[in-house]
């Protein structure tokens, strides 16, 4: 039970894609974070299948809640508020999480907060490094999203600076991995292969670089890699998977970090948060640290487990909106597959 001297106990539920995540948070303290992933079920299809994801969430939700509560050493009746992802994401997957959260809120008579998945990726950094400075620029890089945000206040003031106009960075990783006969999801195997490669051996294009915006494009890069591999095979030249992986990874990290640093400079921001599944990439982390150090910018990257989808990010954002005194969401709220980042809380 929460005492007057303690921050409220928040349960967070995440189900926007292929991870069922449940976590318990007090303020910036993570008590438990349990994730059930269906990635292996999607691997044979080479990508996430919405129907498979929804069924996996249905099977995993209750056991994941139980494991998280046990690990946190709390009872569900101890919870002060429940936070749940309402978007963006896959409609069926989101609906499973929202339905579960509504059921718990009604059964326990607790307030429910429907929050934004993307802003959760920023909020989770507080569980790793403490309260966020205000303002920060956030670079979110995942399989479904690549966005630059200006965050003046996590609960009330998040602005979209730019986003991908076609493929997300993580999606490009998956497609390039398939070209190189590497397993799904593509991020980790490309990162491993690139360690033995030369990132300067091949020059791949940097989409939308120097266009005066903070938008991204990775479709042209993916096509350029495909053409390079096809040309090499047609001409009988050996395809060095490590070199292709390293050069591709260099192109992605180059554009992401340059635009992120430029956004910090333009808005007078001295702190950059990088999160999302692709934030676990070693070259992206190294180049971000190098360029931010040169620009006098502090870069904050959560540990890899917190970068991927999880309940901790949703509980962390829930803790923020509760602390801000914002009213709960209505119990008749619906999922929103294209929820804009400016909508931190559904109310």
Swiss-Prot record:
Protein's UniProt keywords contain Acyltransferase: yes
Primary localization class, coarse: cytoplasm
Binding site for substrate: 140-144, 174, 187, 191, 281
GO biological process annotation, one example: tRNA threonylcarbamoyladenosine modification
Listed InterPro entries: ATPase_NBD, Gcp-like_dom, KAE1/TsaD, Peptidase_M22_CS, TsaD
This protein's UniProt keywords: Acyltransferase, Cytoplasm, Iron, Metal-binding, Transferase, tRNA processing
Required co-factors: Fe(2+)
GO molecular function: iron ion binding; N(6)-L-threonylcarbamoyladenine synthase activity
Family: Belongs to the KAE1 / TsaD family.
Protein name in UniProt: tRNA N6-adenosine threonylcarbamoyltransferase
Organism the protein comes from: Thermobifida fusca (strain YX)
């Amino acid at each position: 039970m929460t005492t007057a001297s303690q921050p409220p106990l928040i349960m967070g539920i995440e189900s926007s894609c292929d991870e069922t995540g449940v976590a318990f948070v007090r303020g910036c303290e993570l008590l438990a974070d349990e994730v059930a992933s269906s990635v292996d079920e999607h691997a044979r299809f080479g990508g996430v299948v919405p129907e498979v994801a929804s069924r996996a969430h249905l099977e995993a939700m209750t056991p994941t809640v139980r494991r998280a509560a046990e690990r946190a050493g709390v009872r569900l009746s101890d919870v002060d508020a429940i936070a749940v992802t309402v978007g963006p994401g896959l409609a069926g997957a989101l609906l499973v999480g929202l339905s579960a959260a509504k059921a718990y809120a009604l059964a326990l008579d607790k307030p429910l907060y429907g929050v934004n998945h993307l802003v959760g990726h920023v909020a989770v950094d507080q569980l790793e490094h403490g309260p966020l400075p205000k303002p920060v620029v956030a670079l979110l890089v995942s399989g479904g999203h690549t966005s630059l945000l200006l965050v003046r206040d996590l609960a009330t003031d998040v602005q979209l600076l730019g986003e991908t106009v076609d493929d997300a960075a993580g999606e490009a990783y998956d497609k390039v991995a398939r070209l190189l006969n590497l397993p799904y999801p593509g991020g980790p195997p490309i990162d491993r292969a690139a360690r033995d490669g030369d990132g300067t051996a091949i020059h791949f294009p940097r989409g939308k670089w120097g266009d005066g915006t903070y938008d991204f494009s990775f479709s042209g890069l993916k096509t350029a890699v495909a053409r390079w591999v096809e040309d090499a095979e047609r001409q009988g030249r050996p395809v060095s998977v490590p070199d292709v992986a390293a050069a591709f990874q260099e192109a992605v990290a180059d554009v992401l970090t340059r635009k992120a640093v430029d956004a910090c400079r333009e808005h007078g921001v001295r702190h950059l948060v990088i999160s999302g599944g692709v934030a676990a990439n070693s070259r992206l982390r190294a180049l971000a640290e190098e360029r931010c150090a040169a620009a006098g910018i502090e870069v904050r990257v959560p540990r890899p487990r917190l970068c991927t989808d999880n309940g901790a990010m949703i509980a962390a954002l829930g803790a923020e909106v509760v602390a801000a005194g914002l009213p709960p969401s209505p119990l008749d709220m619906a999922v929103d597959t294209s929820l804009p980042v400016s909508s931190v809380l559904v109310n």
